[in-house]
C-alpha cells in the first residue's frame, strides 16, 4: 500500500507549499481510545491537519475526547456513533481507524469507496482474504493507505533494512528478541455483564459473531 499522509515520519516535501483553506487536511477519527487517540495526536503535530469529527460507540469516550480536542486545538469536532455517517461528509479527506481488529476491513474498504485516504491500525485484518480485499479497494479507488505498523515508516528503519540486505553483517546465525511487558493479565476471566449506559455494544460487535458483553 502507498505511504500514508498523516504520520509525523512523512516527508515534508508533500506540504512544502503555501497554506490556505484548501491546503488543510480534514481528518476524522473512528475509534477514540488507545492507539486511535495516539495516532490522532501524532497527526495533529502537523499544522495543516485538523480533526473535524470523532466517532465511537461509547458516548462517554466521545464526549471526553471531544472536550480534550477542543482544549488542544480550539476546534469542536462533530460527534458520531456510526462511522457510515462520517464517510458521508464530503469535507473529510482522511480517516484514522483505531477500532478493534474485526472492524478494520469493512471500515477501510468503505472509507476508500467514499473517497477517503486511510490510516488503519495494526493488525491490518483478520485473514488473508480480508487483506486482499483491502489492497484491491485501495488500488481501485486510488486511495493513500497506511497501516499503523511500528518501525516501518521511519527512515531509520529503511536504512537498517538496506544495511542488512547489503550483507555487511555477514551471515546472521542468531537473532535475540525480547519484550519488556506481559499480556498475562488479560488471561484472567471476566464475568459477562450488561453493557454500560452509553455503550452501543451491537455496533461494537459489528461484523463479528455475537457474544455477550464483558468489560
Sequence positions of predicted segments:
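Pol beta-like nucleotidyltransferase catalytic core
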Residues: 183-186, 210-215
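Glycine-rich, acidic and aromatic/proline-enriched surface loops and short helix-turn segments
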Residues: 85, 206-213
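Redox-cofactor-proximal catalytic regions of oxidoreductases
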Residues: 46, 81, 152-153, 211-213
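A contiguous active-site-proximal alpha/beta segment in oxidoreductase catalytic domains
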Residues: 117, 125-203
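Residues embedded in well-ordered beta-strands within globular domains across many folds
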Residues: 53-55, 96, 173-176, 205
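Alpha/beta-hydrolase-fold catalytic nucleophile elbow
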Residues: 30, 121, 178, 207
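N-terminal glycine-/serine-/threonine-rich beta1-alpha1-beta2 phosphate-ribose binding loop
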Residues: 1-120, 126-144
Amino acid at each position: 500500500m502507498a505511504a500514508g499522509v498523516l504520520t509525523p515520519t512523512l516527508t515534508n516535501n508533500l506540504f512544502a507549499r503555501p497554506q490556505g483553506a484548501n491546503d488543510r487536511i480534514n481528518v476524522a477519527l473512528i475509534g477514540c481510545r488507545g492507539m486511535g487517540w495516539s495516532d490522532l495526536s501524532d497527526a495533529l503535530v502537523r499544522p495543516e491537519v485538523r480533526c473535524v469529527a470523532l466517532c465511537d460507540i461509547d458516548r462517554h469516550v466521545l464526549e471526553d475526547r471531544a472536550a480534550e480536542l477542543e482544549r488542544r486545538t480550539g476546534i469542536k469536532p462533530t460527534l458520531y456513533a456510526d462511522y457510515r455517517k462520517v464517510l458521508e461528509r464530503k469535507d473529510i479527506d482522511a480517516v484514522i481507524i483505531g477500532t478493534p481488529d474485526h472492524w478494520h476491513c469493512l471500515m477501510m474498504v468503505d472509507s476508500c469507496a467514499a473517497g477517503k485516504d486511510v490510516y488503519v491500525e495494526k493488525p491490518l485484518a483478520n485473514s488473508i482474504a480480508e487483506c486482499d480485499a483491502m489492497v484491491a479497494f485501495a488500488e481501485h479507488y486510488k486511495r493513500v493507505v497506511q497501516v499503523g505498523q511500528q518501525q516501518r515508516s521511519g527512515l531509520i528503519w529503511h536504512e537498517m533494512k538496506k544495511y542488512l540486505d547489503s550483507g555487511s553483517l555477514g551471515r546472521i546465525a542468531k537473532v535475540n528478541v525480547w519484550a519488556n511487558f506481559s499480556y498475562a493479565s488479560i488471561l484472567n476471566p471476566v464475568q459477562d455483564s450488561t453493557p454500560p449506559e452509553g455503550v452501543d455494544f451491537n455496533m461494537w460487535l459489528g461484523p463479528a459473531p455475537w457474544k455477550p458483553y464483558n468489560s
